[in-house]
Amino acid sequence: MGAYKYMQELWRKKQSNVMRFLLRVRCWQYRQLSSLHRAPRPTRPDKARRLGYKAKQGYVIYRIRVRRGGRKRPVPKGATYGKPVHHGVNQIKFARSLQSVAEERAGRHCGGLRVLNSYWVGEDSTYKFFEVILIDTFHKAIRRNPDTQWITKAVHKHREMRGLTSAGKKSRGLGKGHKFHLTIGGSRRAAWKRRNTLQLHRYR
């Protein structure tokens, strides 16, 4: 096995004494830093490389801190108006994962970069920490490489805002296999609409 395989196995055993100590110390370190800061290198090089990261010019890593828990509806003094069934304020569950929220915040902060992917690096009782891989699409090393030219196209601007990253697609229910049958036809709404529309074709 190569070195990255050993690292992967280490990260799979998060309850081991070594990893518990490491994650605890790192969470303390991350809490002292700002909620969005640039990391000099990936904390998990094996995971970052599997997601497309290369240790060369044009690739940037940002570490994001996201507060855990549900989403409180932003209404003044809980005044939601309307019928009591829609009066919920506190027990609201956000439709997207905290990982996709972290990607969105990184994309907003670094508007000139493109979000490639992200991965989990730690959590405590209050926060979750993710590292986001961003790409500078105007760097010659990116534009001249056939493997990364696809992300330089304008259609990939702010892909994290439109649910086109891996974490975003998971929240949209998109994927392959029997687990994703609710989105056959493009999206949950398209699948529901097709299954709930009566079509009476003309007999010819």
Curated annotation (Swiss-Prot):
UniProt keyword terms in alphabetical order: Cytoplasm, Ribonucleoprotein, Ribosomal protein
Subcellular localization, as worded in the UniProt entry: Cytoplasm
Q: Name one GO cellular component term.
A: cytosolic large ribosomal subunit
UniProt-listed GO biological process terms: cytoplasmic translation
Q: GO MF terms on file?
A: RNA binding; structural constituent of ribosome
- Subunit organization: Component of the large ribosomal subunit.
Q: What does the similarity note say? A: Belongs to the eukaryotic ribosomal protein eL15 family.
What does the record give as the function of this protein?
Component of the large ribosomal subunit. The ribosome is a large ribonucleoprotein complex responsible for the synthesis of proteins in the cell.
The name this protein carries in UniProt is Large ribosomal subunit protein eL15
